[in-house]
């Protein structure tokens, strides 16, 4: 569960390392976001010569959370870190590589690009 002020790792090669959630998108009173949800982020730490700079604001999709996601068969998939992938205004990833596993819950028309770039789909 990600809320405003949550710090996330960035799991792509856009140049960002850490990001902070500044808004959960999808409703005026929505408080929490989980895996597959889109949030607004501010870049808090970035590498030199990356595609994004510190302080810039982007959309991002959450791909891993410590809270995890519950499947219909009763299993729960949890991760050690909270992680996101930076998106442009057309909801396409800025980076060309994804680091670490992603869950099957991202498999819809919007995020098939992320699924295809990921090294492992759980």
From Swiss-Prot:
It holds the Pfam family Ribosomal_L14. CDD domains: Ribosomal_uL14. The keyword Ribonucleoprotein applies. GO terms for biological process: translation. It comes from the Bacteria. Binds to 23S rRNA. Forms part of two intersubunit bridges in the 70S ribosome. Belongs to the universal ribosomal protein uL14 family. This is Large ribosomal subunit protein uL14. It comes from Buchnera aphidicola subsp. Baizongia pistaciae (strain Bp).
């Amino acid at each position: 569960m990600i809320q405003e002020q949550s710090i996330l790792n960035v799991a792509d090669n856009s140049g960002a390392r850490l990001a902070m959630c500044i808004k959960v998108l999808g409703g005026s009173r929505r408080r929490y976001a989980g895996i597959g949800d889109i949030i607004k982020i501010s870049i808090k730490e970035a590498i030199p010569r990356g595609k994004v700079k510190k302080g810039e604001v982007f959309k991002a999709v959450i791909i891993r959370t410590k809270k995890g996601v519950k499947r219909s068969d009763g299993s729960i998939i949890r991760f050690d870190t909270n992680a996101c992938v930076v998106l442009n205004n057309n909801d396409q990833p800025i980076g060309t590589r994804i680091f670490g596993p992603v869950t099957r819950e991202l498999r819809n028309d919007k995020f098939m690009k992320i699924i295809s770039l990921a090294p492992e789909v759980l």
